[in-house]
């Protein structure tokens, strides 16, 4: 009888070194114990793959909120700040960033919940993230399919965002609503010397929409600044373009917003970043936190990869190299499509705290 080759045996049966004593073991949720969603999400940390990242993101945000819940010390109260929107409010300033497609989707209601109950301190979004919120106050967005023909939809005057459908009439209604407000802003600029910035424009629109289903209605009501460094890159920019022919002269100052955003970061006792999506919103928040030598808490949610060197795909460790996240922080990136995971994360963090604290408030009746 022949013996197995020693080279093969040594290769297959190579002895292992012991792992560190505190290394967690892989373990999933046992449904024999019943259905407890909190325990289910707690089990994600040791499930592996992106379930682990999701579980760690929930932990990171809860640590962020634990810090935010602490009262300011007497010497930390920002009594000299005259801008109510950027005044320090807690021991952790929470920056929320998201892209326009999330507002087009049902995540709008998740984001509105955060603004409604003043659970965040600052928003950074894109032009679409602004206009889509207001447009939904004027007319609905519909479910469609990724496979619908673009040629047929164009002939019917229907725009597709993934598997969502937006009739072009919605943008016509938006034009009817926003043009008089742009006239009003131009008149204030001429008569009162008002210097408009993207955040001030969004605040004015939020005040005028009069609809509590709107994110920016609540941002205006709760004095949450909304920054949009690319305000003209969307339908709102289209309206401003048309307005520049009808009533030329409106000036938008982006530098004052940069100063406000960076000042919020510099003032922060601790800083937390929750960035859903990539592109300009991700870098704008991260770069503001560079001004304080990095954020203390960070969660990124997107599907981008780092192989192409894009900022969207960059892992948190790359941000640490730039000083945008602190060296001793425990940041998390969840590689997932946001509509799948962001409501779950909010449910296990912000919403759980809100409802467990008995802070449920009566909702206002929707009105346009």
Curated annotation (Swiss-Prot):
Cofactor(s), names only, from the UniProt record: NAD(+)
Organism: Drosophila melanogaster
Family of the protein in this entry: Belongs to the deoxyhypusine synthase family.
TM annotation in the entry: none
A GO MF label: deoxyhypusine synthase activity
Domain of life: Eukaryota
Enzyme Commission no: 2.5.1.46
Associated pathway: Protein modification; eIF5A hypusination
Protein name: Probable deoxyhypusine synthase
Keywords: Hypusine biosynthesis, NAD, Transferase
Residues where NAD(+) binds: 100-104, 126-128, 132, 233, 278, 303-304, 337-338
GO term, biological process aspect, one: negative regulation of reactive oxygen species metabolic process
